[in-house]
Each structure stands twice: as structure tokens, then as C-alpha cells.
Amino acid sequence: MTTRGRGEPGLEDREILQRLQTGDAAGMEALLGQYGALLRYVVKPILPREEDREDCLSEISLRIWERVGSFTEDRGTLAAWLTAIARNMALNHARRRACGHRRS
């Protein structure tokens, strides 16, 4: 694994981003392989039910796929960007659950 500098993704991150930005599904597989544990770590305390976590993680994957073009290295690391997406989406999911609304 490459050591990452502050605000500068390592080679693996660049490769993952490049694949995602070209629409290569293998990029998402690589991203989830490398950062899936981080995403689960962020989501778990917010969504204690496994079913809710799995639903949310699917939504997170879709959001990453749709918005990968908005990631810029000068604003932070890939891990920080993914953490922000996961946290915000988990909070939104929890709010919907609390209100009794389910996303269809």
C-alpha cells in the first residue's frame, strides 16, 4: 500500500478515480475493496440496524458513482471525501427512518 501525503492521493487512489471517471465498474470494485471498511465504520454508529446499513451503503455507492467528477485533490483526500458522503447519507437515512419514510 502506498503511503499517502496530506491532500495528495496515492497511486492507488488516482487509478481508482481514473477508472471511476471513465465509467469502469472495476473502479467501484477497487474503491469498495480499499475503502469499504471505512464506509462501514462511518455508517455503523449512525445506523445500528444491519438492514439500514446495507441499504445506505448501496445508496452511498451510487452517490459516489454519480459524483466522482466532483472530487478534487486540492480540497482533501479521497478518504475524507468518502467519509463525508457516507456520514451525510447515513444521517439522511436515519432521519428518514425516524420520520417513518422509506426511500422507494
Feature-to-residue mapping (PLM):
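Short, charged helix-capping/linker segments at alpha-helix termini
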Residues: 2-7, 21-30, 40-59, 70
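Hydrophobic/aromatic residues within well-ordered alpha-helical segments
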Residues: 31-35, 39, 86
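Acidic, Ser/Thr- and Pro/Gly-rich low-complexity regulatory segments
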Residues: 10-16
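Structural recognition of an alpha-helix C-terminal capping motif at a helix-to-coil junction
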Residues: 41, 55-62, 76-88
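Short acidic-aromatic loop segments in the C-terminal HATPase_c
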Residues: 65
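Charged catalytic carboxylate motif
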Residues: 12, 38, 81
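Arg/Lys-rich amphipathic alpha helix in sigma70-family domain 2
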Residues: 69-70, 84-104
